[in-house]
Structure formats: C-alpha cells, structure tokens
UniProtKB/Swiss-Prot annotation:
GO process terms (BP): methylation; peptide antibiotic biosynthetic process
Keyword annotations of the record: Methyltransferase, S-adenosyl-L-methionine, Transferase
Catalytic activity: N-terminal L-alanyl-[cypemycin] + 2 S-adenosyl-L-methionine = N-terminal N,N-dimethyl-L-alanyl-[cypemycin] + 2 S-adenosyl-L-homocysteine + 3 H(+)
EC assignment: 2.1.1.301
Family from the record: Belongs to the methyltransferase superfamily.
An annotated Gene Ontology molecular function: N-methyltransferase activity
Family matches, as InterPro entries: Methyltransf_25 (IPR041698), Methyltransf_Superfamily (IPR050508), SAM-dependent_MTases_sf (IPR029063)
Keyword Methyltransferase attached: yes
Annotated protein name in UniProt: Cypemycin N-terminal methyltransferase
Upper classification of the organism: Bacteria, Bacillati, Actinomycetota, Actinomycetes, Kitasatosporales
Length: 245
C-alpha cells in the first residue's frame, strides 16, 4: 500500500490543492448516480484523502464514511467538512472492520492502484464485498492502463496552474514490465516549493475481473468516462462497477 507518511503535515496543503484540481468530484457523483441513487444512501469512500470526493458525495445527499490511512489528510478533511454528513475514520482499507454495511463503496482517482501487490488488491476487494449491502455496488475510478503504457520508460511532465499564485508540475514514469507508475508532484509558489509522490501498480480490466471473482465480486459495468460513454480502446478512463456475486 502507498505509504501514508507521503502525505505528512509538511505536504498536506500542497496535496489538498492538487487533489482539489485532479479529483473528479462532480464527475464521480454523476457517474455513480447513473448506476445507483445517492440521496439518503450510505457511502463508504475509501482512500478519501482530504475529502474532495467525500464532500461531493455528501452534497448529493449521501451519508459518507470517509476512510484514509493519513492522519494529516483526515485533519484537513475535518477542517473543511462544515455541516456535510461525512464521518472521518483513520484506517487501512485493506482490513475493514465496520459493523455496518453500505449501499455504495467508492475509490476515486486511482486509489485502487495504490494497493501495490495483487494480494493486496484481492484483500481490498474482499473487504469491499464484506461491507456491501445486498444490491449495493462498488465503484473503482481508474485511469485506463493504456495511458500509462504509452509513456514507456520515459518521464513525462505536465504543468498546471493552481489558482493565481501557484502551479504544480506532475512528472510520471511508467514501468510497463512491473505495471508501475511513479508520479512526482512539485507545487511551486513565489517563495515556496513542496513535493510529494505516489507509487501505483495498475491492473488491466481482465485482471480486475479475475481478482473480483476471487474476492466474491463481479464486474457488472465498465464506462469510459464520467458521462457514461462506452469503454473502448480510445478511452482514457476505466470506470469499473462491482457487485457481490
């Protein structure tokens, strides 16, 4: 699993700025809502970070339990929560131990790929299966692996503005043999420079189908965009819907 210390107190403000820009938010809500209602439903948001997706789900009427291993991330979430119906829980989402079950489970912005080994991914999917209500669904928001594979072994960098006075440069290096992607985020202001990174191991759709079956789940839908476009060879997103077998 990705090291939660990556998102420590020194980097958390920068991480929150980047997450607010990159996380799908409204797009995630639109996609989930096209498969399951959210208003009045319970949602387990795994790997919630500083709460960007959790807040969007709550604003759609869901009661959200937001789980993350990074205490600084959850502290930031709690500062920004206001009156949204979001409960923050610190924990490793490979080992879920809630007494309750949920209508919806979400993992946004490649959180599923932060489980590094296949065994970790299967353990994570088993935890999801245990915590889904009958008729519930889990939603894995993933970049299509072809996007990573096109990079080869060469580093690629893209710079985005963060408001009026900061910018972030995202540098990614892909290891196609190991199915790994290293993303380095460099947030720059006039007098500040903050860096953090994420190490992810992607899985193909065929691998997700197999791991899901092992874990007691099945893939019941795959979309190519948050707007529900079909998943094709040209899709940049791989949005996977899972249900209990």
């Amino acid at each position: 699993m990705s090291d939660p210390s990556v998102y420590d107190e020194t980097a958390i403000e920068a991480y929150d700025l980047v997450s607010s820009m990159l996380s799908p938010g409204a797009g995630l809500v639109a996609w989930v809502s096209s498969h399951r209602p959210l208003d009045g439903r319970t949602v387990l948001d795994l790997g919630c970070g500083t709460g960007v997706s959790s807040f969007a789900l709550a604003e759609a009427g869901a009661r959200v339990v937001a789980v993350d291993a990074s205490r600084p991330s959850l502290d930031m979430l709690e500062k920004k929560r206001l009156d949204r119906d979001v409960e923050a829980v610190e924990g490793d989402f490979r080992d879920l131990t809630f007494d309750s079950t949920f209508d919806v489970v979400t993992m946004s912005r490649n959180t599923f790929f932060l489980a590094q080994e296949q065994e970790e991914k299967i353990a994570l999917l088993r935890g999801i299966a245990r915590h889904l209500k009958p008729g519930g669904a889990a939603f894995l928001d993933c970049t299509d692996p072809a996007e990573f594979q096109r990079a080869g072994g060469d580093a690629r960098s893209v710079t985005y503005p963060l408001g009026r006075d900061r910018m972030v440069t995202v540098t990614q290096t892909a290891d196609r043999a190991g199915q790994q992607i290293l993303s380095i985020f460099l947030v720059q202001g006039a007098t500040t420079l903050t860096a953090f990174h994420e190490q992810a191991t992607w899985a193909t759709l065929a691998e997700i189908r197999l791991m899901a079956r092992i874990a007691g789940l099945e893939v019941t839908g795959v979309d190519g965009s948050y707007a529900g476009e079909p998943y094709t060879a040209r899709s940049r997103e791989m949005l996977v819907v899972l249900e209990r077998q």
